[in-house]
C-alpha cells in the first residue's frame, strides 16, 4: 500500500507540474490534484482535514493580517516608492546577485512570518518594486514569492 501511495504522489506531482506549465489556474490544479490523490489513497478527508487544521491556527491569522496591514501602510504612505528610489541606484550594479540576495532576504523574513501569504505581503510590497526598478523582469521578480 505504501508503494501505491508513493506512485500516486509522484504521478500527482508530475500532473501538477504539467498543468502549471500549461498555465492552468493554480488554485484549481492544486486542490484538484490534492483531492484526487487523497481519494486514490483511500483517505478522501485527509487533505481537507490537514487544510482545516492549518487554517485554524490563531498565530497564522495574526501574521497574515499584520503583514497585509504593513503592506497597505507602505503603499498608502508611498514609502514603498521612496524605498525603491533609494535602493535602485546602489542595487543596479548587482544585477547578477539580486535574485539570490532577494531569495535569502525572503528566507529570513519567512522565518519570522511562517505564513506564505503574510511573507509575500510583507516582502512583495518592497522587494518586487526594487527588483523591477533594478532591471529584473517582472515575471522573474514575481516568482521569488
From Swiss-Prot:
Report how it sits in the membrane: Multi-pass membrane protein
Q: Which residues form a coiled coil?
A: none
Q: Name one GO molecular function term.
A: C4-dicarboxylate transmembrane transporter activity
State its location(s): Cell membrane
Q: Does the keyword Cell membrane apply?
A: yes
NCBIfam families, per the entry: DcuC_1
The family assignment reads: Belongs to the DcuC/DcuD transporter (TC 2.A.61) family.
User: What is the protein named?
Assistant: Putative uncharacterized transporter HI_0586
Amino acid at each position: 500500500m505504501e508503494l501505491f501511495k508513493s506512485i500516486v504522489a509522484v504521478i500527482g506531482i508530475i500532473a501538477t507540474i504539467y498543468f502549471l506549465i500549461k498555465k492552468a489556474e493554480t488554485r484549481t490544479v492544486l486542490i484538484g490534484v490534492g483531492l484526487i490523490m487523497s481519494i486514490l489513497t483511500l483517505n478522501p478527508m485527509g487533505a481537507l482535514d490537514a487544510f482545516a487544521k492549518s487554517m485554524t491556527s490563531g498565530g497564522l491569522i495574526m501574521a497574515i493580517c499584520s503583514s497585509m496591514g504593513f503592506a497597505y501602510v507602505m503603499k498608502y504612505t508611498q514609502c514603498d516608492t521612496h524605498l525603491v528610489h533609494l535602493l535602485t541606484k546602489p542595487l543596479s550594479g548587482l544585477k547578477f546577485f539580486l535574485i539570490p540576495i532577494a531569495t535569502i532576504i525572503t528566507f529570513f523574513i519567512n522565518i519570522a512570518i511562517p505564513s506564505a501569504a503574510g511573507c509575500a505581503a510583507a516582502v512583495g510590497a518592497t522587494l518586487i518594486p526594487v527588483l523591477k526598478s533594478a532591471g529584473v523582469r517582472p515575471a522573474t521578480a514575481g516568482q521569488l514569492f
